[in-house]
Amino acid sequence: MEYDYKLLYPRQVVLVTSQSGEKRSIIALAWHCPLSFKPPLIGIAVGKTRFSHYLITEGREFVLSIPTENMESKVMSVGSRSGKDVDKFSAFGLTPLKADVVKPPLIKECLINLECRVAAELDAGDHTLFVGEVVATHASATKDKLLFDMGGRNFFGIARE
């Protein structure tokens, strides 16, 4: 049976940083969800062929970052190149910040950064569902619009209160 996964859209877009040793990358994702309040758990689905999949598997940590609507072009660029061949921070004008607990960097331009340690992973076909325990949070006081994906590279912003 086939289904059109776009029926599940719109979805909020996030950026996820990962690192193993000195290698780091950023991936744009719309497949993510909160899983638990206590402990605070977040799930992200990452394609098994992605460089970020390798980094998360090896490093066992990631940072989930919430971009603003005005970051749409940067999010598109991040999602269009492999971090295996390019440093996405410098290539796309994003500022890495040292995290408090984990090795992958925060993204300065994002509204929220959630530092996560991999608590579990689930084989999910051509993706892996990484369950991250949130070990530190960073939030901006700005009220910029959140970025959502309608599927097919169509984006829009939603105001937050």
Residues covered by each model-derived region:
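Basic, polyanion-binding surface patches
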Residues: 1-161
